Amino acid sequence: MLSGVCARLASALRGTRAPPSAVALRCLHASSSRPSADKRDRTEKPPRAFDQALLEFLVCPLSKKPLRYEASTNELINEELGIAYPIIDGIPNMIPQAARMTHQNKKQEEVEQH
């Protein structure tokens, strides 16, 4: 059973890797002089999107419950605890201290509506 899960995880991760040429270019780029901010902004690729296939394997580190992906805010949401983990460049930041509370926002909206 565990080997099947590991195989599916490995398969999902293989699909998210950058091509070797991009990695090689980054290494060469890092060893050369640093470009100006204007040039770097024009040549950088847009941030990578989150691969939703990983939701099968990711759980909240606090409750061990499945998470829901919210594309509009680019976060992984734990409805039960009312927290949202940010996703930066396609990588979820699952550190509990980095999560934001979502229940407080809902309570404030309810108070403002009444």
UniProtKB/Swiss-Prot annotation:
Pfam families: Trm112p. Its main location: mitochondrion. It is found in: Mitochondrion. Residues 1-35 form a transit peptide. GO terms for cellular component: mitochondrion. SUPFAM superfamilies: Trm112p-like. InterPro entries: Trm112-like (IPR005651). The keyword Mitochondrion applies. Residues 51-97 form the TRM112 domain. Keywords: Mitochondrion, Transit peptide. Belongs to the PREY family. PIGY is derived from the same bicistronic transcript that encodes these 2 different proteins. PANTHER family: PROTEIN PREY, MITOCHONDRIAL, ZGC:162634. This is Protein preY, mitochondrial.
